[in-house]
Regions:
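Conserved catalytic core of the tyrosine transesterase superfamily
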Residues: 1-230
């Protein structure tokens, strides 16, 4: 084989797209604003609008707080949720279970949705079965909100927030990891939270945190401090 001794070129690894903290805040502001009542809405329409707003806020808060894949978000069940402990058990790739952690804003958003939003959506079910769906997140007809529905809703929210075209639910997962590293989190802890089997998969996020690299460099290198400008 004349080509046997020739190594194939290695393609550069594509770096993930990441949102700035301010951009995530804009997205969250959009879902918060949707909770405000719209003057002139009839009661039924107002109830549905409010229920979907509670759901969307819980969706975004949960996705960002726990760094979930979209499939994990869609399949999350009530039985896997421990609000008091701030934990959500999810089934990741390879049928491997892990625990996603939820901060106070995410826990509050989920609690509000379960109390004010989900019951309204369940009332709109067209399924005659008495068995209620175990999934946490439901669509406007009280059925489980699937991956396609999640993507569609997320696209609409991102467009309204003025975020770049192409931002996806997975972008929030990338942002979750990068913001943790920027905040000083240990790489192996982030690996565990993301459910990555190999540390090398998580290390890609170290290449998209220039702010963190600059900070560590300035603190560690004896001649890294810049001269002050007159």
């Amino acid at each position: 084989d004349p080509w046997g001794g020739i190594a194939t070129p290695r393609l550069p690894r594509r770096l993930p797209r990441v949102l700035e903290v301010e951009q995530v805040a804009r997205l969250l502001a959009i879902v918060e604003a949707d909770l405000d009542p719209v003057p002139g809405d009839d009661p039924e329409r107002a109830a549905l609008r409010s229920a979907l707003a509670f759901r969307d806020r819980a969706l975004v808060e949960t996705a960002y707080a726990a760094g979930l894949r979209i499939s994990e978000l869609a399949s999350a069940t009530l039985g896997s949720l421990e609000i008091r402990r701030g934990e959500l058990r999810v089934m990741g790739k390879g049928r491997k279970e892990r625990v996603g952690l939820l901060g106070r804003p995410a826990c509050q958003a989920i609690a509000d949705y379960l109390a004010e939003g989900r019951p309204v959506l369940l009332e709109r079910r067209t399924d005659a079965s008495e068995v209620l769906p175990p999934e946490i997140f439901l669509n406007h007809l009280g059925a489980p909100l699937g991956v396609r529905g999640l993507r569609y809703r997320f696209d609409r929210l991102c467009a309204r927030a003025g975020l770049p075209v192409g931002v996806s639910p997975h972008t929030l997962r990338h942002s979750f990891a990068t913001h943790l590293l920027d905040g000083g989190a240990d790489l192996r802890v982030v690996q565990e939270l993301l459910g990555h089997e190999n540390l090398a998969t998580t290390q890609v996020y170290t290449h998209v945190s220039p702010g963190r690299l600059q900070s560590v460099y300035r603190e560690a290198h004896p001649r890294a401090r810049r001269l002050s400008t007159p």
